[in-house]
């Protein structure tokens, strides 16, 4: 008998959603709706996104917000901030910093980065707690992107970020803190230990 489903599948990425809005809606909303219906009597913990906070500026954000609206009452939605760590997409900022390959940086953006190990620990805490609803999952610390690259001596083009993305995605970890979870991995220490300086 199944008593818990953890649903982490789906399409991610703001930029791709601008080119493929229908794909994002079909996968993230309609596909997940089928899962919700099939497991209607089972507790479901599912991946949402920090982009689901208002205002919704792109198809990815709207698909995640819609997903939360149709989620069953016994479910738990997880609004991930910007996840980094082993096997992260090579086009994401932290992998680019690690290999000294940052072509440009958004001058008006700040980001809350969460290490995948901390994310897994957060999910484990949610499984054990039996809480329901929606929660952010992030480090709870916002990082100005200009300050981040300057700290590591990276010189790159500076551009104003797209209006289709949030300026900041700082997580409110209150629910997770209340059940005993706090992030353990420090972003700057992680980069320092894993960066290729050659």
Predicted segments, located by residue:
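NAD(P)H-binding glycine-rich loop region in Rossmannoid oxidoreductase-like domains
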Residues: 1-26, 54
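Amphipathic terminal alpha-helices
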Residues: 186-198
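Core catalytic loop region at the nicotinamide-binding pocket of NAD(P)H-dependent oxidoreductases
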Residues: 103-105, 126-137
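NAD(P)-dependent short-chain dehydrogenase/reductase
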Residues: 59-61, 65, 69-112, 116-120, ...
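C-terminal "lid/loop" region of Rossmann-like NAD(P)-dependent oxidoreductases
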Residues: 106, 134-135, 143-173
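Conserved Rossmann-fold NAD(P)-dependent oxidoreductase catalytic core, especially the SDR/UDP-sugar
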Residues: 7, 33-61, 76
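Active-site segment of SDR-like NAD(P)-dependent oxidoreductases
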Residues: 11-15, 49-57, 81-84
